[in-house]
């Protein structure tokens, strides 16, 4: 019995380490993806709506083996409109994010998009009727205060483009809320397949409306790389959550901030201002507090 307990204790930490490693690798892949996306939209001036289409279109192609394994039968659902709404919101979030990367430095964009959990809390209270205690409201207020410090709306240099990462956080938060409402009544495979199948045509429609652009030469190669990085990063996320509890691996997702700051400095020479770290500290602290609070709530007996 003693040997079995020791074996069990040895296995659990190893799974936790593997989960953390996959999450860090996902963060690195997303950081490189953001560099490629910003290079395409900012340096090469490729239209952002078309950029979103090509990036996720190629990601869809790279995801076809996964989709084939699941089969289109996984799309069977009693809630098609709910799925359609969440994917439309996710697609609009992608459009806002890519347009944001075309206009603002990576470090600012990634810090602001990390406000998404706070929009989820607001939405959970308003639309799902979840109870939100004073501590969670305080954490949400702290997170938005951090975002305001980074945005500096009182500055003369603030432009509408700086709000795009916040808009993407709002849209992705709304999409996550609908996903949350589906997790108890739908299979994970169904939720995943609907996203994979619908995201590309929706992005395609938005690209056509904005003036469709076709990449060639080196630009096409960069979009292939962006699609591959998107598929790989999402796959690494799946492996992370499969290896260990989400509550354990989620804090490692916050490493995306320093990883993106480093990537922005290496490839674009961005040197973030000191106020970034103050605002980011508020956002990170509030996010970690909310996560720990959620863990305690889930562990309470019904």
From Swiss-Prot:
Compartment list: Cell membrane
Superkingdom of the source species: Bacteria
Keyword Repressor: no
Stored SUPFAM superfamilies: Multidrug resistance efflux transporter EmrE
Induction of the gene: Negatively regulated by riboflavin, probably via an FMN riboswitch.
Residue span, EamA domain: 30-151, 170-291
Keyword Transmembrane helix included in the entry's annotation: yes
Transmembrane spans: 16-36, 44-64, 87-107, 109-129, 158-178, 191-213, 227-247, 264-284
An annotated GO cellular component: plasma membrane
InterPro entries tied to this protein: EamA_dom (IPR000620)
Topology class, membrane: Multi-pass membrane protein
The entry's keywords: Cell membrane, Membrane, Repeat, Transmembrane, Transmembrane helix, Transport
Function comment: Transports riboflavin into the cell. Can also transport FMN and FAD. Required for normal nodule development during colonization of pea plant roots.
Family: Belongs to the drug/metabolite transporter (DMT) superfamily. 10 TMS drug/metabolite exporter (DME) (TC 2.A.7.3) family.
UniProt protein name: Riboflavin transporter
Species of origin: Rhizobium johnstonii (strain DSM 114642 / LMG 32736 / 3841) (Rhizobium leguminosarum bv. viciae)
Lineage: Bacteria, Pseudomonadati, Pseudomonadota, Alphaproteobacteria, Hyphomicrobiales
Gene: ribN
């Amino acid at each position: 019995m003693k040997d079995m307990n020791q074996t069990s204790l040895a296995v659990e930490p190893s799974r936790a380490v593997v989960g953390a490693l996959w999450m860090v690798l996902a963060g690195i892949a997303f950081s490189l993806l953001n560099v490629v996306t910003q290079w395409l939209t900012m340096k090469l001036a490729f239209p952002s709506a078309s950029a979103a289409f090509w990036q996720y279109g190629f990601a869809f192609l790279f995801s076809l083996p996964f989709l084939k394994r699941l089969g289109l039968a996984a799309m069977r659902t009693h809630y098609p409109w709910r799925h359609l709404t969440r994917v439309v919101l996710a697609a609009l979030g992608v459009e806002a994010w890519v347009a944001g990367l075309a206009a603002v430095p990576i470090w600012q964009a990634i810090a602001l998009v990390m406000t998404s959990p706070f929009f989820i809390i607001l939405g959970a209270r308003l639309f799902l009727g979840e109870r939100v205690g004073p501590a969670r409201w305080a954490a949400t207020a702290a997170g938005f205060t951090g975002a305001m410090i980074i945005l500096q709306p009182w500055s003369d240099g603030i432009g509408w483009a700086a709000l795009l990462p916040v808009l993407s956080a709002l849209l992705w938060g709304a999409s996550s809320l609908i996903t949350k409402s589906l997790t108890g009544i739908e299979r994970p495979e169904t939720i995943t397949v609907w996203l994979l199948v619908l995201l590309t045509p929706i992005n395609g429609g938005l690209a056509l409306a904005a003036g469709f652009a076709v990449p060639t030469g080196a630009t096409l190669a960069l979009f292939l790389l962006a699609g591959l990085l998107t598929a790989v990063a999402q796959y690494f996320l799946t492996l992370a959550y499969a290896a260990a509890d989400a509550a354990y691996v989620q804090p490692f997702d916050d490493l995306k901030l320093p990883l993106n700051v480093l990537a922005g400095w290496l490839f674009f020479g961005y040197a973030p201002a000191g106020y970034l770290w103050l605002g980011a500290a508020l956002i990170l602290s509030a996010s970690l507090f909310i996560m720990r609070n959620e863990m305690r709530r889930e562990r309470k007996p019904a």
